[in-house]
């Protein structure tokens, strides 16, 4: 019996990850309420102080369990994204300078492009790849502003990526799907905990890596199209703000999901 089997039944690991995440968050919530309480402001979608940083449990459970259900690119991909989670956690605790955050995002993008065994990009396309990956990281972070939105979308996207060839790929991604599901039980409206930068930036990089891992361009484009409701909102909002001469990274309430919520839609209906 090997520690890292070539394949494993994904459902058991999915359920285990969901249960572990739910239980660990139950234990961690009192600490987060003392140390990482997000106070509502004019740009917030929530109306009462809510702890953030719960994504740290998703990162830990989904990453640690992945190798036990199949060793391969999908199981070591989360480890490549851990530096972003660490910087995101520090940023949740105390605001980091933007330069540090973007530097780690850039380095993570470089690592993903160099390490993932996908079709190598021509050298002249590398800058475009770096921009695309860092954009996805930030887009997922931008969209983490409504109860259950990013967590539920990422469940669908990671599960869709697991449908690729080879049973180990599906099994290796099962813990991340389960961890997201366990987190969603706490994050669904009215949310008792937010993901925080520790979770959203990690998941953005993870999704970018999963796109790069697709065996052919058709599957990669299909995965991107599945993410369009999430990433498209952020993309077009950035374009509008650039056209208006506004600062892209300044907090605002101009995303489609924010406008729908302001128009009276509930968090659950928008999600």
Regions found by a protein language model. Give the residues of each.
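"…together with the soluble PPM/PP2C metallo-phosphatase catalytic core" -> "…together
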Residues: 2-235
